[in-house]
């Protein structure tokens, strides 16, 4: 496994791989890797000849300076995990390498609608930062396929739209959520939880599942369903942040024509903002 820190060296290797006709897969990450990331790597390995994992804590997608400062940096441990998975390349640049002129004057990629709705409404600039860095990585790595987790459902939808709108010839693979045995979705931010909070955390998935059962049974009283879910979260020790029930294919509000719903749930538990989602097939 080769660890690359410079754009110049990355381009040299990508050029060689292209000349050799290799199929390239990209797994973009911010590091602090867990089993969910390893599932992305496994999917990438099954889909290509060469796997490139990027590790970059992207300052453009953080709406709070303190959140950026405390995000875990575990590069050595991450590389050890990736080496055991037989990843070919790790691209781990510094912010100065990615944004030589800083982020203020950086050209950006914005996906209208999807970047400012739902999660984007509460985190201004977040999705613009995501689409910009992903677009930049696509240009640098030139992958044939890229793997993203379905836990960040809106992010995945945004990337798919960006790829379609910008004409990228890249297959986007959404990889299902990986959960702990107690149901908690794996996330780098789970590390912010205290031992007591970790015991409470699976309650998010329990509330999510209860909402899913109601929808699957034909209940369409969405405001009431959401209000009950918020109350249940708060009673369990969370601070409910946002619960949305949307069309899984458009992320717009449900209509009579909607075939699938996605439940998007976010709640604070101590210093950790936990997110999760479930897709429900609607009875027609």
UniProtKB/Swiss-Prot annotation:
NCBIfam families: panC (TIGR00018)
InterPro entries cross-referenced by the UniProt entry: Pantoate_ligase, Pantoate_ligase_C, Rossmann-like_a/b/a_fold
Keyword Cytoplasm: yes
Residues annotated for beta-alanine binding in this entry: 61
Gene3D superfamilies referenced in this protein's UniProt entry, alphabetically: HUPs (3.40.50.620), Pantoate-beta-alanine ligase, C-terminal domain (3.30.1300.10)
More details: The reaction proceeds by a bi uni uni bi ping pong mechanism.
Keywords carried by this UniProt record: ATP-binding, Cytoplasm, Ligase, Nucleotide-binding, Pantothenate biosynthesis
GO terms classed as biological process: pantothenate biosynthetic process
Main EC class the enzyme belongs to: ligase
GO CC annotation: cytosol
Superkingdom of source: Bacteria
Gene assigned in the entry: panC
Role noted for this protein: Catalyzes the condensation of pantoate with beta-alanine in an ATP-dependent reaction via a pantoyl-adenylate intermediate.
GO molecular function: ATP binding; pantoate-beta-alanine ligase activity
Protein name: Pantothenate synthetase
Lineage: Bacteria, Pseudomonadati, Pseudomonadota, Gammaproteobacteria, Enterobacterales
Pfam families recorded: Pantoate_ligase
Organism: Klebsiella pneumoniae subsp. pneumoniae (strain ATCC 700721 / MGH 78578)
Residues annotated as catalytic: 37
Compartment annotation: Cytoplasm
Pathway recorded for this protein: Cofactor biosynthesis; (R)-pantothenate biosynthesis; (R)-pantothenate from (R)-pantoate and beta-alanine: step 1/1
């Amino acid at each position: 496994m080769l660890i690359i820190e410079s754009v110049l060296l990355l381009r040299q290797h990508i050029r060689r791989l292209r000349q050799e006709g290799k199929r390239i897969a990209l797994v973009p990450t911010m590091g602090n890797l867990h089993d969910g990331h390893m599932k992305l790597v496994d999917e990438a390995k099954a889909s290509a000849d060469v796997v490139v994992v990027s590790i970059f804590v992207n300052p453009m997608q953080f709406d709070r300076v303190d959140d950026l400062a405390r995000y875990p940096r575990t590069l050595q441990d991450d590389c050890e995990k990736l080496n055991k998975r037989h990843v070919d390349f790790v691209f781990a640049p510094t912010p100065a390498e990615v944004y030589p002129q800083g982020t203020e004057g950086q050209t950006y990629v914005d996906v209208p609608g999807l970047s400012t709705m739902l999660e984007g409404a509460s985190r201004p600039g977040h999705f613009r930062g995501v689409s910009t860095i992903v677009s930049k990585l696509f240009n640098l790595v030139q992958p044939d396929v890229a793997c993203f987790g379905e836990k960040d459902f809106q992010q995945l939808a945004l990337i798919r739209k960006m790829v379609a709108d910008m004409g990228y010839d890249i297959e986007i693979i959404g990889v299902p959520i990986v959960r702990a045995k107690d149901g908690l979705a794996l996330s780098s931010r789970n590390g912010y939880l205290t031992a007591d909070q970790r015991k409470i955390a699976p309650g998010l998935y329990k509330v999510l599942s209860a909402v899913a059962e109601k929808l699957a049974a034909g209940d369409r009283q969405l405001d009431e369903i959401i209000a009950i879910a918020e109350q249940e979260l708060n009673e369990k020790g969370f601070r409910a942040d946002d619960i949305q029930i949307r069309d899984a294919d458009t992320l717009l509000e449900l209509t009579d024509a909607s075939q699938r719903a996605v439940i998007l749930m976010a709640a604070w538990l101590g210093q950790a903002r936990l997110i999760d989602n479930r897709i429900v097939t609607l009875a027609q």
